[in-house]
Swiss-Prot record:
This protein removes the N-acetyl group from bialaphos as one of the final steps of biosynthesis of phosphinothricin tripeptide (PTT), also known as bialaphos (BA), a natural-product antibiotic and potent herbicide. One of its GO terms (molecular function) is triacylglycerol lipase activity. This is Acetyl-hydrolase. Belongs to the 'GDXG' lipolytic enzyme family. The active site is at S143, E237, H267. It comes from Streptomyces hygroscopicus. It is an enzyme of class 3 (hydrolase). Pathway: Secondary metabolite biosynthesis; bialaphos biosynthesis.
Length: 299
């Protein structure tokens, strides 16, 4: 049964969510400011470090048990930042008992595909170079960031780099061709995303690359040899079938995968955890998954 807060959150989204059209820069500003509606829960900006061609922010939650989480924010690849997702990445890090490195990967149109993948790979390698054991490192991302996490895992595997312990995929955008039936069947139930806008954003990111390229759309990739994945998706999302396709790709490859469909939930409901109990519960589930993958009792 959904919480009493759910309807209020849905109304707030419909009243206040940023425009789905227009130039990228105003949308970026609106996206970063959107979190102010719920606040960053007193989480101050962390130390900013250079990672190759981009930057990242260390978010150090209250709980740290020798684990590190590389967080990749959503925003259709062109929007979002560590700032817009600080309250989410911090909460997930706290639930996972991990310090969080939130990556500010390069974004289109300035830096199209595969820049974001290159940055995610560079950030993970930096963690290893700093002495983080791969078995104590995990990846997580929401929406485009979830697809990016699985893309980075494929690239790391292909390069022979030791892989992290696990990855969490929140409402993954895993098929940039936007071919899933849920783009039609759940259109009337979706309150955040618009398929036409997603296609425009995909074109901007891909800059002529085939939308089925496995490092752009991991639902079309070979996921053999990847670490365990947790996929969480809401029942009301137009990206529901992206999540299912990603699960099926993992199953086909023999990669351990846990799929969770959360009834009545919308795209990346975790982002609203300051006011939405279901968001808090989903974060706790994801955190427990990451703790288990990295060794629950280890220090």
């Amino acid at each position: 049964m959904a919480s009493p807060e759910l309807e209020l959150v849905r109304e707030l989204i419909e009243l206040n969510w940023h425009t789905r059209n227009g130039e990228v820069e105003p949308r970026r500003i609106a996206y970063d400011r959107a979190q102010e509606a719920f606040g960053n829960l007193g989480v101050p900006p962390g130390d900013v470090v250079t990672v190759g061609h981009c930057t990242a922010e260390w978010v150090r939650p209250a709980r740290q048990d020798g684990r590190t989480l590389l967080y990749l924010h959503g925003g259709s690849y062109a929007l979002g930042s560590p700032q817009s997702h600080r309250h989410l990445s911090s909460a997930l890090g706290d639930a996972a008992g991990a310090a969080v490195l939130a990556l500010h990967y390069r974004r289109p149109p300035e830096s199209p595909f595969p820049a974001a993948v290159e940055d995610a790979v560079a950030a993970y390698r930096m963690l290893l170079e700093q002495g983080c054991p791969p078995g104590r490192v995990t990846l997580a991302g929401d929406s485009a960031g979830a697809g990016l996490a699985v893309a980075a895992l494929q690239a790391l595997r292909d390069a022979g780099t030791p892989l992290p312990a696990a990855a969490v995929c929140i409402s993954p955008w895993a098929d940039l061709a936007c071919e899933g039936a849920s783009h039609t069947t759940r259109k009337a139930r979706e309150i955040l995303l618009d398929t036409a806008d997603l296609r425009r954003m995909a074109e901007r990111y891909l800059a002529g690359t085939d939308p089925r390229h496995p490092l752009a759309s991991p639902a079309h990739g070979d996921l053999t040899g990847l670490p365990p994945l947790l996929i969480q998706v809401g029942s009301e999302e137009v990206l529901h079938d992206d999540a299912r396709a990603l699960e099926q790709a993992a199953l086909k490859a023999g990669t351990p995968v846990t799929f969770e469909e959360w009834p009545e939930m919308f795209h990346v409901w975790h982002w609203y955890h300051p006011v939405l109990p279901e968001g808090r519960r989903a974060i706790e589930v994801a955190g427990a998954f990451l703790r288990t993958a990295t060794g629950e009792g280890l220090k």
